Amino acid sequence: MCSSDLKTKIDWIDSRAIALMLLTDSSLKPYSVSSYHRENLKSLTRYRFSRVQKRSRQKSSISRLVTILFPELSQLVPCIHISSIYAMLEELPGASYVASTHLTRLTNIISKASRGRFGREMAIAFREAARTSIGAKIPAKSLELRHTIADVRAIESEIREVEAEIQKLMDEETTTITSVPGIGTQMGAFILAEIGDFSRFDSPDKILAFAGMSPSTYQSGKMISSYAHMEKRGSRYLRFALFNVTKYVCNYEPGFSAYLAKKRAEGKHYNVAISHAAKRLVRMLYAIETNGTLYEVA
């Protein structure tokens, strides 16, 4: 082919080839209303995934900043990522601020945010720890802490709004996926959105391949590896959803719990055992979704 041929317009040839394929291929299906809903669901679930990931990163930043400004705080409460602690740190972003504040003000802040769970005794503990704290007084870090907490609050509001929209779409779906113990609306929606119509796949193994959960094959000459690793080439979103939801199913469904325990007893690493349970879950989901039946605990 000469170089001038590379710039030749062949749109009409492509259009003719596409039209002929659409006319002659009987296996092709029209774009249905259900497909539209699943695409809309996919956009929402992936957006929710990105917001949850960002929230996790921001919470890590808060933990880092608290370690710099008020390291003793994490020893006084089970978790610093709660409303009462956020409320205190937004107004008093550092040990030096907590140490110099009036006890009544501090008590009011944490009592209101915790709905009475934390009171004067906890306020005294916070202030005493702040007065002997080794935390640094860095105004720039304190400002960053306040802004990061505000970011987390905004992201959480966005997540709630997205989850409400996902719930609306799931109410319109004819699915039995949430009948499985451990699969809630959000994770069920995530799986449905990534897989789409289960009937598009000839077998559950095709779904596993689509998720990148099929074992890879290594071959050199006549030697074929018997220690195949997972491919991890498919949809990372579907793989993430399946792995995470499998952990919940193994907690709430006795059959899967026993299966996970069996794999662990065989000496398999926890993550490897979860991957085996995830494959079993996919086969089960394929069966109930294609047959339109509810899951029944054995």
Give residue ranges: language-model regions.
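A detector of single, family-specific signature residues
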Residues: 1-298
